[in-house]
Amino acid sequence: MSGSSWPRAVFERIHTVSSDPWGVGSRPYERDKYRHTLTLLAGRRFHHALELGCSIGVMTARLARQCDHLLAVDVAEAALAQARRRCAGLEGVTFYRGQLPDDFPDLPAASCDLIIISELLYFLSRADIARLATHCLRVRQAEAPIVLVNWTGPTDTPCDGNEAARHFIATCLAAGLQVTYARHHAHYRLDMLGHVAKADYQ
């Protein structure tokens, strides 16, 4: 692939070929990723959360238990159709189709107290990663965490997972945020941005 962000048509085609092209509902890697992400957020309740890159809604269904309102975004209508079915019985969950960062949801400034971006950034160009970070900073409440989950294995995307995370984090650091949590697991990295006195690294 080139350095350009992947277009919507690619994701629609991928989800037409397979109902779960990333194995988000079956792979041990995915279960481990969900577990660590939710552990990071354990004990917290969120009023307005934003999930970018919700795919078929596996993480959405789990995250919804901690949220009064959850807006889940994906580029592929085929993926969102599955996500809607999966989350049909859950209150407060809304889905939105958009090609990020161009179609970022029209949300009020400082309206989200949690933003999660999972397995999305490396499909974007470096310029689009910076634009997405700017959008997130605008809608983020002052104390809200931004959580990044990125696959770090080989990929033919515009950036690999580590590069994508670094570019997003750099934009946030320039705006005054700090890395409050960073862990590198076997196949993915989990980062959280916010405001604290001391970052937690391992």
Which residues are covered by each model-predicted region?
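A conserved beta-strand element that flanks and buttresses the S-adenosyl-L-methionine
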Residues: 116
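Hydrophobic adenine-recognition pocket in adenosine-nucleotide-binding enzymes
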Residues: 120
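Class I (Rossmann-like) S-adenosyl-L-methionine-dependent methyltransferase catalytic domain
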Residues: 1-52, 56-108, 124-202
